[in-house]
């Protein structure tokens, strides 16, 4: 089975052609600078192709994608008919979507309804969907929402303590993001530990970071909120702060709210604390060379991650498994070690030698650790492909 996975941004479109059963990616690429001058980056195995191709809209980007996939020299299929379905990443499903779903007119209207909650991403996601529908009208299309996995949270976790009319009229609540990654890691961890009923905290740590408390495969709480700005401090995002900071800064420095939020989203986090970089590798190098601000940034990050693990351990009444995933979670052993050092009170113990390895799926806790600690490389594209295949096969 061939699933085409589409992740449409405002001026870009990422794609992968994948077998959902084996996880084998036959081709992948990126259409970038859509609406400007257009460039295609295409990869099959170790072979890379870069072409400058005009792409005024996402429709041309989809057409370019399908052409290169069928290309005699660089393609992997002979006909579009070999694509069984298309899975689209959609950022925000709001309160409309609790799971992935086959796209029809009603689904598109509901995604449009969620645009106020995802004003940057949802319109781009819709452009990708409509472009695919135009070029592949008979091929099933599936929407996979970044927020859906977190929709099993109870009201005590997702409601904000603000007047009810903002929830009832404007759907203001905690939604959470990186849901496809959290879902994949939760499923994969269940396979690794050999059971479905257990309590876990997953740490998706990267330039954008989020954590989730999961019980028996269902999300109970997560760190991001109405937007991805909430939770732990990130590469350039502040994470949780006193909301009154916004008013204080706006009043003192003459900023408007949009300018202040731009600062909190793009000029804060590790970049602000270190004064050097948002990249954890740069911070590690800086700390080793005696830069105290770089050391503080990394320590602040580990401290906040550990705090949320502790909070979620309380919310779940204990945890059985702690998982690390995404760029920093999979590759930065020093961050994992420091987080786990904070969690000694939970009986967390890790093997330093195992923890020193990068990017590999493995158990890094010791046999006498009271909590299993795993590194589980995420695979959001595979999760999208599997969700898409399950829905399409069920509809036959």
Description of each model-found segment:
Residues 3, 12-55, 225:
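Short glycine-rich, Thr/Ser-proximal phosphate-binding strand/loop in the N-terminal lobe
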Residues 8-9, 88-91, 205-207, 323-331:
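Glycine-rich beta-strand-to-loop/alpha-helix junction loops that act as flexible
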Residues 68-83, 189-194, 309-320:
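Phosphate/pyrophosphate-binding loops at sites that engage ATP/ADP/AMP, CoA/4′-phosphopantetheine
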Residues 69, 73-121, 142, 149-159:
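Short beta-strand-loop/turn "lid" adjacent to the catalytic site in phosphate-handling enzymes
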Residues 149-252:
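Glycine-rich phosphate-binding loop of actin/hexokinase-like ATP-binding domains
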Residues 215, 221-256, 262, 326-357:
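Catalytic phosphate/nucleotide-handling subdomain of diverse soluble enzymes
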Residues 262, 269-273, 280-315:
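Adenine-nucleotide phosphate-binding core of ATP-dependent small-molecule kinases
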Residues 295, 299-317, 329-396:
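Internal helix-turn-beta structural module
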